[in-house]
Amino acid sequence: LSVNIPKMKSDLARYGIQYDQWFFESSLHESGYVADTVAALTDKGYTYEKDGALWLKTSQILAENLRRAGKSDEAIEKLGLKDDVLRRANGFYTYFAADIAYHRNKFAVRGFDKVINIWGADHHGHVARLKGAMDALGLDGAHRLDIVLMQLVKLVQDGEVVRMSKRTGKAVSLTDLLDMVPVDACRYFFNAKPETQMEFDLGLAVREDSEN
């Protein structure tokens, strides 16, 4: 973290972004706030134990919300809702448990009236689950938590998609992109249609003619 966070801050500064506060997930575990949040869900009757793990009744929470929204039991059944593990059999809490605690902290401790998250579209399946967990805690996630999904971007160079792979470590970072394309062009391309999957044409971004 001591190496990566300063690099992140430097890269974001080049893009024109500065965060006012950095929050460490580890602080939630060290303070016992994750355990306290899970205990709060248990006190409200929204957890159960199975196979040595502690589970959140996600399917029940979401079904209750959907019924209030007018969905029929038949329609809800077709969704195949599933429950989520909060604490594994080995005693370690899941990322989802920490995520619930983090958002509970924003509402219940830091006093946020509204929280807006910006996520990649590949996390769309997590939206209803997190909102539901806030509802289960009495924090009105349906109205106080907004989640904006940003689509993924394909980089195109000389008419070919630039192939990237997590497995092989082949990637183009933001700072790599800013070495090739002016920051204003990057910001324009990314903000033009954030809700739509797009191709970022590196050649077009630096071209100075009527097509750009």
PLM-predicted stretches and their roles:
Residues 2, 6, 94, 179-180:
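Alpha-helix N-cap/helix-start motif at coil-to-helix transitions, marked by capping-box chemistry
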Residues 20, 56, 95, 124, ...:
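Short, electropositive, low-hydrophobicity segments enriched in small/polar residues
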Residues 103, 107-212:
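Catalytic adenosine-cofactor/nucleotide-binding cores of aminoacyl-tRNA synthetases and other
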Residues 27-30, 60-63, 153-155:
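Short, internal active-site loops enriched in acidic
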Residues 7, 98-102, 129:
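Well-ordered alpha-helical segments embedded in enzymatic catalytic cores
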Residues 1-51, 106-120, 143-151, 197-211:
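Conserved alpha/beta enzyme-core scaffolds, especially Rossmann-like or related mixed alpha/beta domains
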Residues 33-108, 134:
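A contiguous, basic/glycine-rich beta-loop/short-helix subdomain that forms a polymer-engagement track
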